[in-house]
Design a protein with these regions (language model features):
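RNA pseudouridine synthases
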Residues: 1-84, 88-93, 189-203
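Residue-level signal for inorganic ion chemistry
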Residues: 4, 45, 72, 115, ...
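Short secondary-structure boundary/capping segments
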Residues: 22-24, 35, 62-64, 103, ...
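A generic structural signal for well-ordered coil/turn residues at beta-strand boundaries
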Residues: 29, 40, 66-69, 81, ...
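Residue-level recognition of beta-strand microenvironments
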Residues: 36, 77, 118-120, 153
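Conserved hydrophobic positions within beta-strands
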Residues: 74, 114-117, 150
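A structural micro-motif recognizing beta-strand termini
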Residues: 75, 129-132
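Pseudouridine synthases involved in rRNA/tRNA modification
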Residues: 104-112, 122, 132, 136-209
Length: 209
């Protein structure tokens, strides 16, 4: 983020006095048009100037033309090979750090996720998820709702006996978005993280699909 401050230039950032950088960053976060949960890896796009920031941000706000795809290693097998999860998401009244999926109520914010089970190994599943909204913890909450919490999720899943040291197995692997000056969607891809590769090696060794 500090690098983005530099790229935005003096004309867009007020003259700074010592100790003011953190305050401006917390209020403005220049160039940051979307975010990932703390332990989620993968693609994040930023802007170098205000016009580009507005152009990109509008697509995230309106969910227009943009495609966001993730992969996740989950604990459990989904009942169906693929499907759409449509719920509202609210903050869990019993635990303020958690969110939960609810249906049949106007409470909370609507959230929609499309999932596809790529393969299963024992009681683990490799999932592809595309989100049509961008709620906090959306994929993590929806996988929990599906009874397939994400491996390594310290909030929505129990510590796994087979992979007790696993971190959150969620990776933003693909982003399709319009960028200024181009008519067609630009495609950005993230390589598979090493931690995913190591877990998949163990699953393929110990289980058949």
């Amino acid at each position: 983020v500090n690098a983005l401050l530099y790229h935005w230039g003096r004309e867009s950032i007020p003259e700074l006095k010592e100790g003011q950088v953190s305050k401006i960053l917390s209020n403005r976060r220049p160039g940051i048009v979307h975010r990932l949960d703390k332990e989620t890896s993968g693609i994040i796009i930023t802007a170098k100037n205000h016009d580009t920031e507005e152009f990109l941000s509008a697509q995230f706000r309106n969910h227009s033309s943009i495609v966001k795809e993730y992969i996740a290693i989950c604990i459990g097998r989904p009942q169906h090979q693929h499907g759409i999860i449509q719920t509202n998401i609210i903050r869990d009244p019993k635990e303020r750090k958690r969110f939960k999926a609810v249906v049949g109520t106007e409470e909370g914010k609507p959230a929609e996720s499309y999932y596809e089970c790529i393969s299963c190994y024992g009681e683990y599943s490799l999932m592809k998820v595309r989100i049509n909204t961008g709620r906090t913890h959306q994929i993590r909450v929806h996988m929990k709702y599906l009874n397939c919490p994400i491996l390594g999720d310290g909030i929505y899943a129990h510590q796994d006996k087979k992979f007790p040291k696993a971190t959150l197995m969620l990776n933003a692997r693909l982003l399709k978005i319009k960028i200024p000056g181009k008519e067609e969607l630009s495609i950005f891809k993230s390589p598979t993280p090493e931690r995913f590769i190591e877990v998949m090696k163990v699953l393929k060794r110990d289980y058949t699909k």
